Amino acid sequence: MHMPFIIDAHLDLSMNALEWNRDLRQPLKEINRREIGMTDKPDRGNATISFEELRKGNVGLVVATQIGRYVGPDNPLTGWHSPEQAWAQTQGQLAWYKAMEEEGQMAMIRDKKALEAHLALWKDGEPADKKPIGYVLSIEGADSFITVNHVEMAYAYGLRAVGPAHYGPGRYANGTDSTGHLNAMGKELLRTMDRLGMI
C-alpha cells in the first residue's frame, strides 16, 4: 500500500532532544526504556517521536521549532530571566539541528528549490528508512530575539517562520492566557518578517 507523504506542521524536536535528553536517532522503545523510573518531567517513558517513527509514517517534512521563553520579574511562569539567556538556548537548539544535518538525519529547507528537491527525493519510490527528514525552521515565541535585528541573524542561519507570541506575556506580543496586543516592538518584528519573506 502506498503511504501518502505527510508534513508535520509543528514538532518540538530540539526540545525533546535537549530538554528531555532524548536521542531521537534511537528506536522509540529504547528512548522510553531509558526513561523508566524518571520523574523529572510528566510523561516520561511515553515518547512518541523518533526519526525512525517519522520515516515509518512517511513524515518527510516537519516544521521544527526553536523555543526560548523570557519571563519578566513579575511573571510567575518558568523561563529565562533575560532575553540573552533565551537566545543562547535557541542557539543550542540550532546546533543540535545542525549536528543532525551532519549525520544525514535531517535536511534544512530554506527555499522553494530545496523544497522541490526534497520532495523529489521522498517520492522517488525508494524506501524512506535512510532519507533525511526535511525541516523548515521555526521559532515558537519571539521572546529570545534580543532585538529585532536578531530576526535578520536568524533568517541568515535558516529560520523561516516566527510565532510572535507563545504562552503568557511576551516581549513582542501576549500569548495564551494573557491579554494584550502586538506592542511597538511586535509591529517592527512583523515589518521585518514581511521584508524578509518570513511566515
Predicted region positions:
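Substrate-binding cleft of carbohydrate-active enzyme catalytic domains
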Residues: L189-I199
